[in-house]
Amino acid sequence: MAGASMNDIKARIKSVQSTMQITKAMELVATSKLRRAKEKAESCRPFYEVLKGAIDDVFSSCELRDSAFSKKGEGGRTLYVVIAGDRGLAGGYNANIFRLVANLAREKEGVILPIGKKALEYYKHRNAEIFSDAFPSVAEVGVGDCLAIAEEICNSFKAGNFEQVVLVYTKFVSMISQVPVYEDLLPLVSNHEGEPLEFMPLIESDPEELLEAIVPEFLGGILWSSVCESLASESGARRSAMNAANKNAGEIIDTLMLKYNRARQAVITQEITEIVSGAEVL
């Protein structure tokens, strides 16, 4: 009986060790990807800040306050641009994004533009209204794709299909911290509103034509920066999850080894007892 128990424990130890080899390999891969994704995300942040500052300066002109991009659409619905991951095994990375979208959508009816395999699968499975399913892999989204998405969003917003457009993604804070956030993309709101500017921007062309040209570029830049942040966050979350899995596996192996040694000691004790008993009979 004890022998069978020992064999079961040995089999469980081997199983956990095999799983641990996989999670260690995944942690190494995630660490490698995280390093590159982190550099890309950090390099995009100055670009993001410049874009935000430029659009604020341009939009601070009173001539642009009545633009189609500054008014809420008449559709009464919100377009949620949701950036999630392409794979699982990343802790609560994807679940946290979906929870944030669900909280936002409680207040307003929403249409989803999913970016990433998990986002597309999640919302299709729940029969959500999908704006576009053209971006099933966030890892394959490039700058050109972000500009194309932005152009499509701007055209739909100007047509009055949506009251507002909200971007939901995960901001990379550190190797161990990633925060799901949301940002209103449209309608445009100037951060300078109510504040006097040191100078008013000089706009030589037609204001509406200017916005027609720069808003899609602006939104495309914001989307690209958010994609980079999300990729770094996914790799960071996966690395943390695999690291935790490795620690748990190590603890399980230690516990099983303790059980195995106790069972082995019990078998040896029993054998010694039987030998001693046999010797006494003789």
Label each residue range with its predicted role.
Residues 1-282:
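C-terminal beta-strand-loop-alpha-helix "lid" module of Rossmann-like NAD(P)-dependent dehydrogenases
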